[in-house]
Amino acid sequence: TTPQPQVKVTRPEIQLTPETPIAVKHIQFVGGTVYPLKELLEPFRPYAQKTVPLKTIITLVNAITARYQADGYPLSYAWLPDNNFQDGNIRIVLVEGYVAHSDIQSDNNGTAARLKRLTEKIMAEKPLRQETFERNSILMTRPPGSKVDANAQLPKNSYGAGGMKVKATQPHIWDISSTL
């Protein structure tokens, strides 16, 4: 038998622009516990069963993110996943961020243990609120002679798990009397 030539046909991907018309037939929110579904749907109601530019949908989704931020959820946001808008179905993913793991760096065991306890308080809250992060971050900076830098990264997954880095440095204190 002779090998048959193989033909591979690839469909060109549709390039979306802000002006791309999007049919709005059904809105599906994936995830999210902070806001009632009815409240999330309300801004979309005027566009139901209509065709609108993509930029209108993006503006509404960005407004959800802005609401999370204004309500004190710094790691939470809304986004439109790829492979969306088929047959007028619009999926909006609500990522309610929290700290799932931490990386604590300190050259002092006592400071590291204290930072771990405070980080665990941050990790216990889902989704993380700004006030919880700030309160515990401020407490992290309390040990005299230590400089602490704590930051949490936005989650890069749909279930909201993010990371936090905490670095404590202590300047070397020289006791001149012991060197004489």
What are the functions of these language-model segments?
Residues 1-180:
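Periplasmic polypeptide-binding modules associated with outer-membrane biogenesis and secretion
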